[in-house]
């Protein structure tokens, strides 16, 4: 009898959490991020920085992100290669395959001691640019991660927290 009672209580708690989860995701846009192009940095560095941008976008809690492994799996099933996909048309095609509302593409660059981040979010359905963010940072690469946090907040349409701007 005790087992049935615990099972019943667990089911009630689980049922109560389902609407909560629906409320949390309500109104959020689904987004996928293409691997950013690296200019003056290695492909590995570009991939690492892209992954960091994705993580920071998730941390804003403003979007529902398609995870990299899910994205790769879906694209592989469709026989689609993401590498070299830098045009808006190609990115929109990827977004349609993934079933997302918006895509983010862009580049990381390095020229001397300066780093640049250029990001663009656009609608998969219409191809219209929703938002662009460009940042330049001069200094050690370690501090570039803070700039990526700011870009993540801005690309999803939010004001970055003050501690990210200091």
At which residue positions do the language-model features occur?
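C-terminal/domain-edge helix-coil "capping" segments
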Residues: 23-32, 50-51, 56, 60, ...
